[in-house]
Amino acid sequence: MKLHELQPAEGSRHTRKRIGRGIGSGTGKTAGKGHKGQNARSGGGVRPGFEGGQNPLYRRLPKRGFTNISRKEFAIVSLDALNRFEEGTVVTPELLKETGVISALRDGVKVLANGELTVKLTVKAHKFSGAAAEKIAQVGGTTEVI
């Protein structure tokens, strides 16, 4: 086989369906839209969720829940992400943002116990999960709630 003999695998390529190009094409005249009716018109069809006038599902089901206006969204940091820092470093939310561990400070930083920590650090954050605080202490590090 030579480079000029390369061909796509059999059945992997399809020719484009050209509609409205004569009756010999199989999709001429009405271009696959049938005769008259709402769907045959330009811009025709029903909106998403329309069920022919029957009360649609999204209106049959009751509303649920609410949006808590005082909800706090914390930036999440996993323990294994803290391994990039040198031993003895004081890890602050500002340092985490500078180094690209988190993209935005949001309403604070929460440290979770995903992965293992191998470096002794002083970690300052707004919240710690119980397991994360335990793992930091095991390595000899300290936690400080801001």
From Swiss-Prot:
Compositional bias segments (type: Gly residues): 21-31, 42-52
Keywords carried by this UniProt record: Ribonucleoprotein, Ribosomal protein, RNA-binding, rRNA-binding
Top-level taxon of origin: Bacteria
Residue ranges, compositional bias (Basic and acidic residues): 1-13
Molecular-function GO terms, alphabetical: rRNA binding; structural constituent of ribosome
InterPro entries, alphabetized: Ribosomal_uL15, Ribosomal_uL15/eL18, Ribosomal_uL15/eL18_sf, Ribosomal_uL15_bac-type, Ribosomal_uL15_CS
Disordered: annotated span: 1-58
GO biological process, one term: translation
Any single Gene Ontology cellular-component annotation: cytosolic large ribosomal subunit
NCBIfam families, sorted: rplO_bact
HAMAP family per UniProt: Ribosomal_uL15
Assembly and binders: Part of the 50S ribosomal subunit.
The protein's role, per its UniProt record: Binds to the 23S rRNA.
Family statement: Belongs to the universal ribosomal protein uL15 family.
Protein name: Large ribosomal subunit protein uL15
Gene: rplO
